[in-house]
Amino acid sequence: MGLPWYRVHTVVLNDPGRLLAVHIMHTALVAGWAGSMALYELAVFDPSDPVLDPMWRQGMFVIPFMTRLGITNSWGGWNITGGTITNPGLWSYEGVAGAHIVFSGLCFLAAIWHWVYWDLEIFCDERTGKPSLDLPKIFGIHLFLSGVACFGFGAFHVTGLYGPGIWVSDPYGLTGKVQPVNPAWGVEGFDPFVPGGIASHHIAAGTLGILAGLFHLSVRPPQRLYKGLRMGNIETVLSSSIAAVFFAAFVVAGTMWYGSATTPIELFGPTRYQWDQGYFQQEIYRRVSAGLAENQSLSEAWAKIPEKLAFYDYIGNNPAKGGLFRAGSMDNGDGIAVGWLGHPVFRNKEGRELFVRRMPTFFETFPVVLVDGDGIVRADVPFRRAESKYSVEQVGVTVEFYGGELNGVSYSDPATVKKYARRAQLGEIFELDRATLKSDGVFRSSPRGWFTFGHASFALLFFFGHIWHGARTLFRDVFAGIDPDLDAQVEFGAFQKLGDPTTKRQAV
């Protein structure tokens, strides 16, 4: 059958057995990819520094998804939070990867079996003797089973009743760990950053799915609705399934890019909005101010800032800084972070504290401007030295470090001051190892950026697929060349040339 590549799926159009076979094979491919990708990531993942070289800096994509569902241990003897373990148990990273690969193999065999034994009695309509599927009944079965799975996940896995719970952290991504979560049944459950909403929404949606499934199993659709929505046509199923998938893809693209309890920053990296709004910078200054209020020195207050919090406040971890088509992990861009140099405080010769204006997300280059507490420009690194009034040399800017590796060190040499002013544009200053991975110094995006781009792109593609297949199933007779105004009954698809009224018609 000489089908063009874009028509090959017609071979399973009226063949339920082989339609099932290709779907099982698709599941085998998806599960096989997931397991294989997990093993590859585990082979290249370095768990030694969860603070400065976490999974998202290393470009891990499937490990964060396993971790947020409660997997934290490896058969290699390490824990994702940096500790060592002696008994990781079956459900380790490798155990989950292996389970997916075994499941993939079983699905592969099942797909072959169903391809060979396609003509099963279960697919045969006893009234006509032809292959057919009771699509409304199948819809009810699937809705019921997915409802059971959804309810079970929310009521048992997430709550820890029978399962590990999920990854939960504080708003600044410092204390994350896997723990049971109680359902949030109040209005707080609608806050996307409240983990309890994950449990309550799965329980509620699962209950609704179970009830809806039972409804569709026990109640037949009205004839006019059945015909109007073409419920007997498998392409209707394809169209509505694509709609469900593209809607879900748009939703998760949003929760990933804007952040939510389902996408913790410890696993996927910070969001761009946290840089734009100075989210971590404000928390750092709040902690320093609290320390000063307790009569700590500036050095002592900055020394108590967690390195993890300081690292989030660095533009290289902003997922919007990496180009969409720059391949590789963040570590391949600006390098592997080795240590925090400390917080630079700039002062002019009058002793006034100056603040470097930070680079906005969508700039590659940005002028070095130092302002005082009132936002008035006091110093800069001029483009044209002949016209400069506020140069570091003229204003006499010095820099002193608090916290980090350079704690207590100060510089007055203009070249060194300008070097650190340029680096302060990018947030907190870190020592970065670019030699190990031959990093090129060009920022990369995090898995948060890749996931969002991929799902938004496929959602758009699938949206058009939904429109395409929905139109095909609703207007199938028109596309086949059958005029609805014809008096004579016409055998469906009997026109040799679509829409050609001169072709011989065959009465039914």
Swiss-Prot record:
InterPro entries: PS_antenna-like, PS_II_antenna-like_sf, PSII_PsbB
Gene Ontology CC: chloroplast; chloroplast thylakoid; chloroplast thylakoid membrane; photosystem II; plastid; thylakoid
Keyword terms: Chlorophyll, Chloroplast, Chromophore, Membrane, Photosynthesis, Photosystem II, Plastid, Thylakoid, Transmembrane, Transmembrane helix
Cofactor comment: Binds multiple chlorophylls. PSII binds additional chlorophylls, carotenoids and specific lipids.
Keyword DNA damage appears in the UniProt entry: no
Annotated membrane topology: Multi-pass membrane protein
GO biological process: photosynthetic electron transport in photosystem II; photosystem II assembly
A GO molecular-function annotation: electron transporter, transferring electrons within the cyclic electron transport pathway of photosynthesis activity
TM segment ranges: 21-36, 101-115, 140-156, 203-218, 237-252, 457-472
Subcellular location per the Swiss-Prot or TrEMBL entry: Plastid, Chloroplast thylakoid membrane
Entry similarity comment: Belongs to the PsbB/PsbC family. PsbB subfamily.
NCBIfam families: PS_II_CP47
Quaternary organization: PSII is composed of 1 copy each of membrane proteins PsbA, PsbB, PsbC, PsbD, PsbE, PsbF, PsbH, PsbI, PsbJ, PsbK, PsbL, PsbM, PsbT, PsbX, PsbY, PsbZ, Psb30/Ycf12, at least 3 peripheral proteins of the oxygen-evolving complex and a large number of cofactors. It forms dimeric complexes. Interacts with PAM68. Interacts with HHL1.
Entry-linked HAMAP family: PSII_PsbB_CP47
Job description of the protein: One of the components of the core complex of photosystem II (PSII). It binds chlorophyll and helps catalyze the primary light-induced photochemical processes of PSII. PSII is a light-driven water:plastoquinone oxidoreductase, using light energy to abstract electrons from H(2)O, generating O(2) and a proton gradient subsequently used for ATP formation.
Name of the molecule in the record: Photosystem II CP47 reaction center protein
Species of the source: Arabidopsis thaliana
The encoding gene: psbB
